[in-house]
Amino acid sequence: MRLFLLLPALSLAAASCSMQPTPSSLSGSWTQPVPGQPGHVQGMQLLPDGRARSINMRTLLYRSWQLDGKRLTLTGKSIGNGNSSLFTTTSTIDRLSRTTLILNRDGNREAYTR
């Protein structure tokens, strides 16, 4: 009988920790620690209108974002060594909560917090 009552409670708890990716659930600032620089963060700001901005990244300038199911596509401009190029990256959203975003691109997982 206890197991019968426990299963719905566990299901509800698991569902509350995870969100479906929607433009409104993704909008906001997402950051991660800068490797080798304790106390510094970098990341992206996803605006509700589909524009994107980089946070503390001078050579990687995000311009826009798009959501297709669980796939997040970011576009922008990469600047370095006197050259610049446009880029598009698509990642799978492995996990999304109010405070955590985990992206997977080609097996490389990146964790962000809000």
Question: Can you annotate each of these PLM segments?
Answer:
Residues 1-15:
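Sec-dependent bacterial lipoprotein signal peptides
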Residues 15-114:
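Lipid interaction determinants
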